[in-house]
Amino acid sequence: MGSHTIQSKGAIALIVVAAALAMFMSALDGTIVNIALPTISSDFGLTTSTVSWVSTIYLLVSAGSLFLMGKLINVAGYKKIFILGFLLFTIGSFACGFLPVILGSFPLLLVSRVFQALGGSIMIVIAPAIISNYLPDEKQAKGLAIVMMLASLATALGPTIGGLVTEYLNWSWIFFINVPVGIFAIILGFIVFPKKTDEKKTTMKGFDGVGAGLIFVGLAALLFLFSEGSSLGWTSLPIILSIVLTIAGIGGFIIREHRARDPVLDLRFFRNPSFVIIVVINALLFGIFAGANYLLPFYLQLIQGLSTFNAGLILTALSIGLMIAGFIAGQVYMKLIGKLKYLLMGGTLLVAAGFFLLSRLHPWSGLGIVAAGLVLIGLGLGFTTVPITTMILKSAPPEKAGMASSISGLMRFAPMTIGIAVFNVILIAGVKYLAGVNGIVSKPPADIAANILTSGFDLCFFIGLILAAVVFILCFFVSEKRLAMVKETVSE
């Protein structure tokens, strides 16, 4: 149990609401903005590459600060950091919608996004951590299921909500809608946490600020590398520099943390093979999920001719599958302790089946095939995400719950960015190759282009199928007994 376990049903419900709000809003803001970028670009007279920094800077700051936020949770306590996270997020959201419009300054939008990203980073880390810390063991899987389901729903609905808000109001309201939710969450934070919430487990004395700086630079450079590599060119100076910074930042961080008295990340977590396997499984699953979620709107709009709104409706099939399976996984988790790897295997097989269907798409394929593939992937993710997240959090002692939550958050956040970039590279390379060797000349050019592009999509989804097979094999090596030993290792 966590160090402040609560038993009251009402208090448990409020804790779950607080965690769900944090995860939902942080996930929603990761996808709601992208669809408004063309409008923002037009309003400020910006190029596509310049306006993309609205999304890029949020990504870099959020990912780079995850481990720092995990450390702050352990130092200051859940209540203070929860309120701080929503305060930064709410102020940043209001500033994003207000200051750039009033003052006509695009740089102010980027500065405001930094504040919003810092708040979002706290929310990503603290949501699963408060579930692990406050809920009884038998309630944790159910609580995490609700939190993760809402996060997935927010990710899927973000573009649709963003499109509707931009079309019928204006892009500023994409940020303004966060404000009342943020105020409500701050009020909730003052009343929901037990009085002893802020009992300190660690202090900032001896805090490894250099390590925090190194991992921030390393992770930010890594995500910049993958998010901008295709557009800037893999041999361009910014990308080469980001490779150098990635190696220097992450390499320097690992060396530093081995020597630090009070490390930002306890590397002893990764001495346990089962912990490493669980983290890799989590990363691979979220990577291929993000890749599919990124590519399918292009297939639905360019090949099937759907509108943005209708394409978004098809994509909600994934969220439906995830919510159903997540609910079931939360209910059966406690009954399957000792046999959880079989739940992971079953979920992975469903993910693989979904990617198999998507890898067989044609320009004339029915939308039912796409929806079925998405439902299967969603079901598979639901059956794997809840037990994986729960196992990661349970592997940490209470004083390092924030650290474990940071690892869990990073292994969702970073692989999604990398997965999108990798699938994009595969698509471009596949289309170029197919266009070069395809000798079909009897069909209209538009039909040939559609066939080639669809074949590129199929190649990406086939790679997703292969990676799902790799995950299935890794599941055989998951040992819950060995995973339970992590807590003893990092507590020494």
Model-based region annotation:
Residues M1-A11, D198-T203, P445-I448, V478-E492:
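Intrinsic disorder in cytosolic terminal tails and internal cytosolic loops
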Residues H4-I12, I102, M204, L232, ...:
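Helix-boundary and loop/linker segments of multi-pass membrane transporters
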Residues L14-L21, L28, V33-I35, T48, ...:
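12-transmembrane solute porter fold
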Residues I40-S41, L72-I73, C96, I161-L169, ...:
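Interfacial helix-cap and linker-helix signal at transmembrane-aqueous boundaries
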Residues P180-D198, F216-E228, L245-R259, V471-S479:
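C-terminal membrane-cytosol helix-exit motif in multi-pass small-molecule transporters
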Residues G2-V192:
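Transmembrane-helix bundle of Major Facilitator Superfamily
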Residues T5-I6, I186-F216, H258-P273, M334-K335, ...:
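Flexible interhelical linker loops that connect adjacent transmembrane helices
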Residues S26, S55-Y58, S62, Q116-A117, ...:
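Structural signature of transmembrane alpha-helices in multi-pass secondary transporters
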